[in-house]
Amino acid sequence: MKSENVSKKKSILEWAKAIVIAVVLALLIRNFIFAPYVVDGDSMYPTLHNRERVFVNMTVKYIGEFDRGDIVVLNGDDVHYVKRIIGLPGDTVEMKNDQLYINGKKVDEPYLAANKKRAKQDGFDHLTDDFGPVKVPDNKYFVMGDNRRNSMDSRNGLGLFTKKQIAGTSKFVFYPFNEMRKTN
């Protein structure tokens, strides 16, 4: 009887140890490797839709660099924003006649094709209002939403973001399940 109790206690301890290890690993993964986020709003439409869930790669924040064109989750004061990095530290960003210029060079934005077409159908002669040039300071990033007519971003209220304020890069949509896809 005594050996049966010892065996049960040993089994319970083994299970408890396995559960603790699993919880610690889950917390480490969630806080330092990748995390789920909910897209709130239409500022990235049609690339991302309102209420979609994305996985965010957080490792780039610690062991890499962000690239122009990355879709990122930003930590705001009370909310998270999902935007696209347009300008890197040291860049000069300008929009003229619906054409993006970085450091004086034209930049192609193929992800805006559907929105540009829709803007013209809606009677607008351009998708993105002219702005700039804006010099992006060191340690800051200039971001914009893909739905330029319906996005608060670095142009109009959110300002520039530091690397510390960027949670990570969105790599794919995982929900709704029937619309899983890469985001970049």
Swiss-Prot record:
The active site is at S43, K83. Changing S151A: Reduced activity. Its EC number is 3.4.21.89. It catalyses: Cleavage of hydrophobic, N-terminal signal or leader sequences from secreted and periplasmic proteins. Changing S154A: Slightly reduced activity. Pfam families: Peptidase_S26. It is an enzyme of class 3 (hydrolase). One of its GO terms (cellular component) is plasma membrane. It is a single-pass type II membrane protein. It is found in: Cell membrane. Changing I86A: Slightly reduced activity. The keyword Transmembrane applies. GO terms for molecular function: serine-type endopeptidase activity. Residues 40-184 are extracellular. Its main location: membrane. Not essential for cell viability, but required for efficient secretion of many proteins. B.subtilis contains five chromosomal type I signal peptidases: SipS, SipT, SipU, SipV and SipW. They have different, but overlapping, substrate specificities and have different transcription patterns. This is Signal peptidase I S. The lineage of its organism: Bacteria, Bacillati, Bacillota, Bacilli, Bacillales.
